């Protein structure tokens, strides 16, 4: 604590609670160094572990690090203590798109088109990275201060590698009113096509102000979804009706794809330009496919310049595993067949490189210098499983604090472990401060001077919460109708999907 304020890890001043869920609370916070407003999601580690959601947390971290896009909520960094996991997220000042619709009512087609463009661009980018959201809905679409859309909540997302041999996903998840028919069937489904369906439901909601599929009886609602039984309001333009019927096609094999959506007449109409932040700037960022952030865990490639070596930086999540007390490697990573060794050092990078080269010379290992502080060390003789090779990569935690990772890239694991134990560890003892996993070390001292954990912010009375702040996480509850159903006199008979297919 400093001056009566709640300070987390010596880096963030924590303010009012924004929302609360079963396993986490979300707080507004400010970066003490940059002054940047952020949202911090505090996850109760014990609760998550008890209900077996470790893999879901791990997946959410992996996916949010993988996806860097202007219309995807940015994960700046992840921190942890013994009892909590902290997601430091981009603060979406505009709140949920759901709340905007509930407060202001249905949008004009021009306004809806702008949000739909951003949604489709974000989803298309996620799919290009092998990520399928699987829970797209207005509650998971946030708005920044310029009312640009941000896709959030990747807790139910799937990676392409999650597919079975048939190339399909098999886990039923998502919110019932937005879920595609093939997902409800509990058979294999294409994650990309299921996301497209959800985008269609969202588009309908934006312009109509209510859900296309809703019934007090959940089974009846499922039947409506599986039959694509819905009606468009009379005020929908012909082009919008045509597009929605092609998206909300119960047959995934004939459902319109994202490239075809982008070529549709309605989609290609001019988009409203936000006066605060022009669409052109967003488009330029989208075309690059990358949003650069200070907390990104991805390392940029650098080359030596005038004799100096540029090293990749590590954020707080990357150095959590430096001590036993903060070690989450078993929680976030598959430790079976562990093939990495890590140590920290306060020696300069030139000393570390010199020591590694000296070690290689003594062991008669071939040395190949790579970019970004990486040395490839290779055994001169072939072993049980080919030539043993390992990479030594150096990361900069702070200018005076380095992390060195030794990782086997080829050869027999037992030979690698023997080499580390009998040769590498003894040879590097003069420069090593601590090897990861050494139990005799004081876990808290490793991060001394880098991070100081302060008490968590106290519980805030509900009457102190600002109603204008977005609720970024809510209790799980049965899906209610988004808004009251439109009067029947405003509804016209739907056009059969078969008549709208190309």
Swiss-Prot record:
Ranges of Polar residues composition bias in the record? 493-502
Q: Which residue numbers delimit the NAF domain?
A: 297-333
- The record's region (Disordered) falls at 447-502
Q: Which residues form the active site?
A: 135
Question: What induces this one?
Answer: By drought and salt stresses and abscisic acid (ABA).
Matching entries from SMART domains are given as:
S_TKc
**SUPFAM superfamilies the record matches:** Protein kinase-like (PK-like) (SSF56112)
Mark out the compositionally biased spans (Low complexity). 461-472
Q: Is Cytoplasm set as a keyword in this record?
A: no
Ranges for the region named Activation loop are 153-182
- Residue positions binding ATP: 18-26, 41
Q: Does the keyword Nucleotide-binding apply?
A: yes
Q: Which UniProt keywords apply?
A: ATP-binding, Kinase, Manganese, Nucleotide-binding, Serine/threonine-protein kinase, Transferase
Gene Ontology process terms (BP): signal transduction
Q: Which one of the record's GO molecular function terms can you name?
A: ATP binding
Catalytically driven reaction(s):
L-seryl-[protein] + ATP = O-phospho-L-seryl-[protein] + ADP + H(+); L-threonyl-[protein] + ATP = O-phospho-L-threonyl-[protein] + ADP + H(+)
Where is the Protein kinase domain positioned along the sequence?
12-267
Name any cofactors this protein relies on.
Mn(2+)
Provide the E.C. number(s) assigned to this enzyme. Answer: 2.7.11.1
The ranges of region (PPI) come to: 339-367
Name the family. Belongs to the protein kinase superfamily. CAMK Ser/Thr protein kinase family. SNF1 subfamily.
Free-text note on domains in this protein's UniProt record: The activation loop within the kinase domain is the target of phosphorylation/activation by upstream protein kinases. The PPI motif mediates the interaction with the ABI (abscisic acid-insensitive) phosphatases.
Role = CIPK serine-threonine protein kinases interact with CBL proteins. Binding of a CBL protein to the regulatory NAF domain of CIPK protein lead to the activation of the kinase in a calcium-dependent manner.
What this protein is called in its record is CBL-interacting protein kinase 11
Species the sequence originates in: Oryza sativa subsp. japonica
The record's gene field reads CIPK11
